[in-house]
Amino acid sequence: MNYVDLTAYDMLEIFSKLQSHSSFDRLAPTWTPRLSKIKEILGSFNVEYKVKHYIVPGFENRYFTNLYISFNTESNEDGLLFLAHHDINNEMSENCQDNTSSVCHILEMIKTLKDKELDRPIHFAIVDSEEHVNFNCCGSQVLSEDIHNGEFGNLEVCVNLELTGLGKHIWVSSFEKFPDSCQKTIERLNAHKVSTPFNDAYVLSIHDVPAMCIGILDDEDLEIAVNSYGYPRIWGLCHSLEDTFDKISKEDMATFQQTLLSICS
């Protein structure tokens, strides 16, 4: 199948119908159906990627896997790194908000930027085992080691995508405080600062990598999140059978995709 003409929304519809393995399945294959589909899509884009396998204690019978893609690495400018976790908690759910919509945004960005002249290095990481909620043994922790080892050169900030399928309002969160290097990007996004549950940006921050998390909310959920009235309804879909494709907005995803591309320049 040729995926070149598909948007993030189109790819999300494909993933929503794909049965795969939970991140907690100790006997899952290295290349789960979800990860194999990502690999297939990247192949369709004719994009080179690096595979990083790693072991999680307690899950020694399987490998977990990060995928890395980089563009314009010859530039001396500080780069941006976008990431999203591809693993899932509930294999019976369509997992559209958590977190396949974000993976599909990453894939569309890769498709769009691969042949563009870029002003700075742009990197992508599609990471594993976020659902384990472990600051010291997950895909983003492995990513932090690779960042410190120079895999991606100098980075201005890492932008973690979560819950990006519905809403016109952009939110951002960070662990304890936003790194100074995030401020320019936050201003360009006109984003609302909120508090969120555990995510990969928190892991990166704990390991001394400048990072923030970004997503979108509708009017009602934005008010809840900004004013700390409770838990936004959209976030409550995570891990549930209600996290379905019919709750996703094609228009909102398209708008958010353009916003993501705008901060790459």
List the predicted regions and their residue ranges.
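N-terminal capping segment at the start of a domain
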Residues: 1-32, 39, 87, 161-163, ...
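Proline/glycine-enriched tight loop/beta-turn segments at coil->beta junctions
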Residues: 73-79
